[in-house]
Amino acid sequence: MDEEIAALVVDNGSGMCKAGFAGDDAPRAVFPSIVGRPRHQGVMVGMGQKDSYVGDEAQSKRGILTLKYPIEHGIVTNWDDMEKIWHHTFYNELRVAPEEHPVLLTEAPLNPKANREKMTQIMFETFNTPAMYVAIQAVLSLYASGRTTGIVMDSGDGVTHTVPIYEGYALPHAILRLDLAGRDLTDYLMKILTERGYSFTTTAEREIVRDIKEKLCYVALDFEQEMATAASSSSLEKSYELPDGQVITIGNERFRCPEALFQPSFLGMESCGIHETTFNSIMKCDVDIRKDLYANTVLSGGTTMYPGIADRMQKEITALAPSTMKIKIIAPPERKYSVWIGGSILASLSTFQQMWISKQEYDESGPSIVHRKCF
């Protein structure tokens, strides 16, 4: 496909929006899924102040803005802001006219049906796209890893899910969803840093904590042992410089924060950890295909980027699975973007071209067409 009519691939995450052209090997635009509105009255006349800012611009002016994320737990909760993000994606980031390109969007599995209908409606009615499609995120990650069978543990900023896929088909009865992901870990880190005497409260300060989390946190192979090490020596301590020059020290918080993925009780949640959720998902599948799932456990999404997470998953799942089972955790280095990469692969396949929902089909059937054409 030439640049002229290349499909646009937009992976709208709860935390980051990844967008680009089908056939590319990486997204052209990656920006925070944030809409910011001024907290104060504008007094400077003629400054061209806007009533809202999107993405990086909102991030850089965060000190004077209230930041809102229109996507929570993978579900769009604020459609007006979502439209702003899409508008920004097409016109400011990719600089394309959406009415000239087919658009591939992504969504979390087990999302409410109304959510994808509304996505479809906005694409056709507001942006006048000639064609569109909604794909499930985890399935795209598996495409990106070059497999058709495996179980994907996809964890982003807003939602984590485990999706078993066999010969290219997602097994809906075995998909499990966990509303515990990056944003919850950021909030938890804010809380445990407060216990150390560092107070982070505003929406802007939360972004600083997110940066600390991304730069310094890791998953311990053995949590209890790591806690003992942290208590007896300062070898695990790291320092971080805040935007105002103040330096803070962070110790056991570095691994206590992501430990909540394995022990959600840290957050006061009753759910199972990501290792148990993955195991339960496999156990809901037919006994004959479990072996293939254990041997192809693929990690995807930004919240799987912690150092040590693959080894820990290997250890935890080995403890749960039958003792003779071969277990392999696949953690591709580009897993932060694997959903997008999978979308880029899918949208450029010649066999996929008949799968698009066209404007004509939409006009005939309305938004519900999305349930028939996208599965």
UniProtKB/Swiss-Prot annotation:
GO terms for cellular component: cytoskeleton; dense body; focal adhesion; plasma membrane. It catalyses: ATP + H2O = ADP + phosphate + H(+). InterPro entries: Actin (IPR004000), Actin/actin-like_CS (IPR020902), Actin_CS (IPR004001), ATPase_NBD (IPR043129). The modification Tele-methylhistidine is found at H73. Its main location: cytoplasm. Its EC number is 3.6.4.-. Oxidation of Met-44 and Met-47 by MICALs (mical1, mical2 or mical3) to form methionine sulfoxide promotes actin filament depolymerization. Mical1 and mical2 produce the (R)-S-oxide form. The (R)-S-oxide form is reverted by msrb1 and msrb2, which promote actin repolymerization. GO terms for molecular function: ATP binding; hydrolase activity. The modification N-acetylaspartate is found at D2. The modification N-acetylmethionine is found at M1. Gene3D superfamilies: 3.30.420.40, Actin, Chain A, domain 4. It is an enzyme of class 3 (hydrolase). Belongs to the actin family. In vertebrates 3 main groups of actin isoforms, alpha, beta and gamma have been identified. The alpha actins are found in muscle tissues and are a major constituent of the contractile apparatus. The beta and gamma actins coexist in most cell types as components of the cytoskeleton and as mediators of internal cell motility. Actins are highly conserved proteins that are involved in various types of cell motility and are ubiquitously expressed in all eukaryotic cells. Polymerization of globular actin (G-actin) leads to a structural filament (F-actin) in the form of a two-stranded helix. Each actin can bind to 4 others. This is Actin, cytoplasmic 2. It comes from Xenopus tropicalis.
